[in-house]
């Protein structure tokens, strides 16, 4: 028979009493009143902050956006199919933030920075707020270094600098994404981290972009943040801020970054959907009153940091889609007024076979030649003016039957210059190649060729120059100026190659 030892039992009880710690936990909770269309109305949550993350009983997370006197409007970051009326909600005390680290390079993520490429988790020891304040006036310095896109028309006439915000605007299917991805490809070896944010795109389009970047080895320095068309509106709205937070992580570590938002029209539509469902009053085109702030607080985060902060930079290329070339619609005018210039892509030019379909006349860069190396300024100075005059003359020439010789020559030169700006997709050019191409056209060396021969001649000239005059590239990359020596080498190469080319064509 087992004997009961009172002293042993009392010592166990005493030990348990000594170990007991009384912990009072105050949890800010609420009850779901109504749920549907990605929105939940919650009663309670008295001390919740605007933008705070809240967690539902079944695990879905949401953001408290509307704080009203008798309920809280929460937007859901998931489908919320298991949330029921009367289920409990608790405030987390946290504002939306994401983990950040170098491990994100080469990966495809969603708006919550979770990998969606099936290559496992990413370890990160640091985190950043998705919405963080933009650098102030003292923290910045003016833009002065070029960010080469590899596209002649842009680098010569609408130059982009590190820390600039340049809008890419145009109708659907005019090559906006192609301009952005070519810019990413051209950053290879330039020590620039790229972030591509796809908002509301088809999953097949995003897969196409990722494949193109992988094939050319560009994913090594690129992060893709994707929320496709079937994602909840909340996540489409958050995706650009997630991309900006990742780019900022590198910017504040003295690195140069490039971020592409493809596209902000879809983000504005997702935000409009959320706002209307939250019963916020609609404004112009049914967008809410703060849609300008939606984009301005995002784009102001792009900056060129001061010397004290390490001179890192974040260059933003937002994309906006227009309907039949209407630049005066609400979202396009908003983003044009926030950015430092725009690249306008025209459907008419695209259909006429001029690709990239950049309308040079109404595209501008408000940073201008400050974002060009001296060699490019020397060569491309007159190019934009000549092309603008050519466009005017061409329109006039349609009505005039007999033109004088000077006008005919100017038209012929203009046609060749336009041909010179055509470029294949995924074939960005180095600065030295661009300088050689522009110099050849602007100085009349192409005038003796047929318009149809220009592109073939220029491709062969660039190869010939690389092979036979490697000093040209060395001079441009080391001195950043178009020296008399470089000019002599280039002229020599052009003369030699024109003879060779004409012999080949006649043969």
Swiss-Prot record:
It is an enzyme of class 7 (translocase). One of its GO terms (molecular function) is ADP binding. Its main location: plastid. Its EC number is 7.1.2.2. It is a peripheral membrane protein. Produces ATP from ADP in the presence of a proton gradient across the membrane. The alpha chain is a regulatory subunit. F-type ATPases have 2 components, CF(1) - the catalytic core - and CF(0) - the membrane proton channel. CF(1) has five subunits: alpha(3), beta(3), gamma(1), delta(1), epsilon(1). CF(0) has four main subunits: a, b, b' and c. This is ATP synthase subunit alpha, chloroplastic. It comes from Lemna minor. The gene is atpA.
